Amino acid sequence: MCLFSPTRLLPLLFVLVGLNASGAGPVFNVLDYGAHHDGSASSTEAMRSAIQAAKAAGGGTVFVPAGNYVTGPIELVSDLVLQIDAGATLRFPAAKLPFTKGRQQGIECLTPVPLMGGHDLHNVTITGRGVLTTDNAEWLKIMPRTKATKDDPGTANGPNWERLLQDLEVKTPAPDEDYQKAAPELRPSFIRFMDSTNVLIEGIHFVGSPMWTIHLLYTDNAVVQNVIIETYPGVHTDGIAVDSSRNVRITSCYIDTGDDGIVIKSGKDADGRRVNRPTENVSIVNCTVHHAHGAVALGSEISGGIHNLVADNITCRGTAIGVRIKSRRGRGGSVEDVRFNNWTMEDVGEAINVTTDYQMEGEVKASEEPVSERTPVFRNIAISGMIIKRAKLAIDIKGLPEMPISGLRISDVIVSAKSGMRGSFTDALELRNVQVNADNGPAFLIQDSKELELDGVATRKPLADAPVVRLERCPGAIVRNNRAFAGTGTFLSVPAGELKNVVLEGNVLDGAKKPVEEAELILNSDTRNQERVIP
């Protein structure tokens, strides 16, 4: 039975009004307001004065000509075009900043003001071929760090933040002194728009970032295009974070970062469900991601839901993961009607990772619990048209026993990897025209899944000592139109007594020494994660 329906993936129709980079109204040159284009002194006040002049005029363009400028945080206003000309570099030194309302780790709280952006704005454009730069390492120096090693300067947030976070998660009023203690442990986003509409960011080159580079929070109708983000190896310097926002288009961007390239979020646990603002109608097209934890990552903060997303024509190289969709017990929320098409990946850790059983290093694994608002739901996800070279792990799918991942379809994928596909706790998983060429283990190991359909799966690298397909506890499985190539030892292996649960149709298995066998278990759910390489 196929629960997946392409018609359920709603078209992404964006009415992007008011996003005109050419601007309207007068032009305000920051040099006329005392900016220092040689970097000899701070231009913070000049930037502020030019922006306020544009505001007083009812809108306009603030122009930053070529030169080197040193500035503190820049608060934008509505009906504004900030044009940063080619040859202009704005450098933001690390500093302790005042607090404003925001969201940190999916929890509403006070956060440092962003280096650029604003709250409750409309019709704002940041454009040009200029450079915005800061030094992630300098921001880390002003923070107390824990668990530091020669390879990792330590966790992003220290014990004071963790204590504050615990208060916020249960909505206990946090004393001002707790915020003051946590302040040195927090960093701002480079650009953040909150509760804003009609936002355009285009052409800008980011070099370094304190934390997230572009953060769209509670924002409707936003475009990020032709942007270059180079923050690798900065700690937690995600490229573009779309957080409880709607109608967002990200196109033709290059991102080289030490964290996720493009990350989609909607709040964490009880606070995220209280806010209850999904991220929806997101289009990500023609982007390249280098390094990064995940090229395009959804979660794990999905408590408000993520709906109607397309990521098409993406190239990633050297990322820990390519496609990453993650959540865990306690989050709640749903990820549904999302599509990943036409990707190329090289030298990645895991090519495709979809899990509702995510846990960070050092966390205690959550125990199984009855289905409730705390249970995350993944359904109607399509992944297709991918060529993947030199992955460590091809595909990793893991749902929850109490809430399997439903309606996941993977099609037209060719992947070479050290280890093959592993999947568990799914409902109506479909693999169509999927080729996994793995160095070891079964090419396809699927456990505890019902209504599974394998149509046209294969390996061009058969192993004499491992089956191509291993199914364990998979009632209602259909295995059809598959081919065993010469040199295959066993094509399909199932535990003793389970072959009756599998329907075989139209397979060409004469290349296998054993087309089908019933054998003792070779792997179990506890060993399936031994090849995991992700942070």
What residue spans do the PLM features occupy?
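Bacterial N-terminal signal peptides that target proteins for export
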Residues: M1-P11
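Hydrophobic h-region of N-terminal signal peptides that target proteins for export
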Residues: F14-S22
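Extracellular/periplasmic carbohydrate-active domains that bind, remodel
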Residues: G23-P535
